[in-house]
């Protein structure tokens, strides 16, 4: 951890070492140390190319994953993307985003999903670039007040992957050991909210896609 302050907060007790100093200056010093071995980088790039090739052969019914794959293939180069918790950032990390002028942002709130909309709005308001928020239904619904203002968001687009609850808890290890009723009540929190009502209330145009053809038509 690099920080100009000698006294640091470490609530998770996970810091192994602390470098006291200005982060930018310290990192510039590391650059001056010279070129390190490229062996690891080369292996990583080979694996990345192999994975990218496999992903082009991916065939499955329309799903959140395939939708994310299509979206990332078609986003403009000069754009900033904000990834919310929990599945959107995992999908994007797995699929990868092609190197370009794209700026990628993400944040994790205390409970994971909280604050994603607000952070994305802040990035949109601080830039003239087209901004794209890729988020889940719970993340979007949890932080709707982030759009309750009179600022211009005409250059912002929002894609909500709506699986009507916390779909992440069906994929990660641990929650399957819970009683199903407890899991639904405290983790998955299933719902039947119609997000078109939120879009209308917030003054956004709304499109719903339930297959690849509808997604590609937008």
Language-model regions, residue ranges each:
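Thiamine diphosphate
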Residues: 94-218
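General beta-strand structural signal in soluble alpha/beta enzymes
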Residues: 1-3, 21, 64, 81-85, ...
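Phosphate- and divalent-cation-binding pockets in alpha/beta enzyme and binding domains
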Residues: 10, 29, 70, 90-92, ...
